[in-house]
Amino acid sequence: MADDWEFAADSKVVVKPNAANNINKWEGEDDDEDVKESWEDEEEKKDEEKPTKTEAPAKTKPNKVLKAKLLEQECLEKEEEAKRLANMSTEEKLAEKLRLQKIQEESDLKSALETFGLTSIDGGLDSFNPQSNEEFKEFGATLSWKIAQYKESPHFPQFIEDLVQALCVNLSTADLKKVKMSVEVLHSEKLKMEKVSVKNKGAAKNRGKATLRTENDDIDVYQKYGDDFTDDYDDFM
């Protein structure tokens, strides 16, 4: 028995590995991952190849009800304004006309100021603060435009005379002389224009008289010829 144990100890025990144990349990995982990745790549390519559909913006339909209400409100406002004007007295209508005229004048003044490159008219003419020569020209042009709106008034000439006197009081004698010369030049030009106008009117009247005189001359010649014939007949008798 002891010999058997010695023999068993001396002999090498060879353990054969199990074939199943040699199989890598992770084997095939890489293949599955490769297949999965290739499948995902194909799906991504298909998604990229698909044409993207752009959604058309939803068309906003006009609110017909709102438009109808606004139109109705506008018509009512016009009717109320017409009734208000119809119930006005003559004095109230005149005041309303002057008010609208003032609004129009302010609008025209604003356009004139914008023409000169001025946008601020909060204070009207008082907003001007001219410093340079160009600014004084703009101020003078605007002021002249404003005053000229009342040129049809019978009080306008006297107003201008008083205004010029009031303004010239602050001038020196040298500057006042310049103003006087400018006014005299303007007066001379006005006289020439009036003479030309009167001359043209006179020429037009003379042309009309010449035509009338020619017709009368024909009648006079006929009458003279008739008188001569009568005289010759009397002499013959």
Curated annotation (Swiss-Prot):
Gene Ontology MF, one: translation initiation factor activity
Family matches, as Pfam families: eIF3_subunit
Gene3D superfamilies in the cross-refs: Eukaryotic translation initiation factor 3 like domains (1.10.246.60)
Family named by the database record: Belongs to the eIF-3 subunit J family.
Subunit-structure text: Component of the eukaryotic translation initiation factor 3 (eIF-3) complex. The eIF-3 complex interacts with pix.
Stated role: Component of the eukaryotic translation initiation factor 3 (eIF-3) complex, which is involved in protein synthesis of a specialized repertoire of mRNAs and, together with other initiation factors, stimulates binding of mRNA and methionyl-tRNAi to the 40S ribosome. The eIF-3 complex specifically targets and initiates translation of a subset of mRNAs involved in cell proliferation.
Name by which UniProt lists this protein: Eukaryotic translation initiation factor 3 subunit J
Organism name: Drosophila grimshawi (Hawaiian fruit fly)
Gene symbol of the encoding locus: eIF3j
